[in-house]
Amino acid sequence: MQNFKVSVILPARNEAATIGDLVLKIKDLYPGFEVIVINDGSTDNTAEAAKNAGADVYSHPYNIGNGAAIKSGIRVASGDILVFMDGDGQHDPSDIAGFLKYMPDYDMVVGARSIKGQASVGRAVGNKVYNWLASYVAKFYIQDLTSGFRAVKSKVAKSFLHLIPNTYSYPTTLTLSVLRSGWSLKYVPIKIRARSTGKSNIKIFKDGVRFFMIITKICTLYSPLRIFLPVSFVLFVLGLSNYIYTLLTQGRFTNMSALLFTTSIIIFMMGLISEQICQMRYERREMDRSQITKE
């Protein structure tokens, strides 16, 4: 931990009851760390409590979103390593040391919650489904897709600023973007404390749909055929099944079979073209990196 500077970023909205104690504990455990609190349009004295505890406080003029607060923190942080954690006191600052010991070898380390650490049974089941879907997309076993407690190298986080949404779904975007871009990721088990005050702002259905859309978006952005190919295959099988059935029962090739076959081919070609565009973007990015010279 002595070889690099660490910035701890705490997005907070109406967390006056917990933010001060959290900042004090971080500073007590890690005196040399930069602690940044992004006050996301709080209507209580969150900013004052954080400032009195010794944090560097930056405020949004109104509530923009948890992801927007993270992006603001990334922009102003000066550390080589950025640690993101919630401002409600559920994350234990002592776990940060366990993250950082892996940082020389990994680009991002994420705290993985146990099933018991999930806020509710419904959310635990939903997260399990999203973990499975994201693992398929990323070709990597994702233990906790939505965990907001993580450490990431600053250069990696900044490279995805344009993709991170303003909402609570930023962990999903960051995790999938890191994996699909070829950066390394490590999961570390953590325990989550119960909220002492307030309640979670995450809505299971609304945010669940958003998580699904983000997984699809990231997949089509970084590995389009992982989405297009299965859809094309299913339509082809349906078309083939319909063709065999109508051929045996009616002795002809129906319009439905033709439609399914044609749609299957179109979707496959769309995936192929998207994959080529994706590859060209990778090549352009690597070309830009190769032009950077050390002073």
Describe each PLM feature range:
Residues 1-124, 128, 151-161, 173-176, ...:
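Structured catalytic core of nucleotide-sugar glycosyltransferases
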Residues 13, 164-165, 267:
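Residues at alpha-helix boundaries and short interhelical turns
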Residues 224-295:
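Membrane-embedded multi-pass helical conduit in multi-pass membrane proteins
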Residues 65, 69-77, 90, 94, ...:
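Conserved catalytic loops of nucleotide-sugar-dependent glycosyltransferases that act on lipid-linked
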Residues 28, 158-159, 214, 279-282:
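Charged/polar, solvent-exposed surface patches and flexible loops
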